[in-house]
Curated annotation (Swiss-Prot):
Any Gene Ontology CC annotation: cytosolic large ribosomal subunit
Keywords of this entry: Ribonucleoprotein, Ribosomal protein
UniProt record, GO biological process: translation
Molecular function terms, GO-annotated: structural constituent of ribosome
Organism of derivation: Thermobifida fusca (strain YX)
Underlying gene: rpmA
Organism lineage string: Bacteria, Bacillati, Actinomycetota, Actinomycetes, Streptosporangiales
Name of this chain's protein: Large ribosomal subunit protein bL27
């Protein structure tokens, strides 16, 4: 293998694409079932009531309702408070 760089080459220029992590729905917002609430690596936020956790630790709403952030046994958690459905 060459140990000299050669004309106009560089050892830099590698970077990963942004992963678009973070909170997607904030406290007080209304969501439908299945909507993504938080994209994360690891469990920065834990699933609370009516919230599921995907294989990549993504939190999503299990029911339609209002998003609420709070503490669950000393950990940050996200819950969804179901909204009563008006009967037609």
């Amino acid at each position: 293998m060459a140990h000299k760089k050669g004309a106009s080459s560089s050892r830099n220029g590698r970077d990963s694409n942004a992963k678009r992590l973070g909170v997607k729905r904030f406290g007080g917002q209304y969501v439908k079932a299945g909507e993504i609430l938080v994209r994360q690596r690891g469990t920065r936020f834990h699933p609370g009531d009516n919230v599921g956790r995907g294989g990549d630790d993504t939190l999503f709403a299990l029911v339609a309702g209002r998003v609420e952030f709070g503490n669950l046994r000393g950990r940050k958690a996200v819950s969804v408070i179901p909204t009563p459905v008006a009967s037609e």
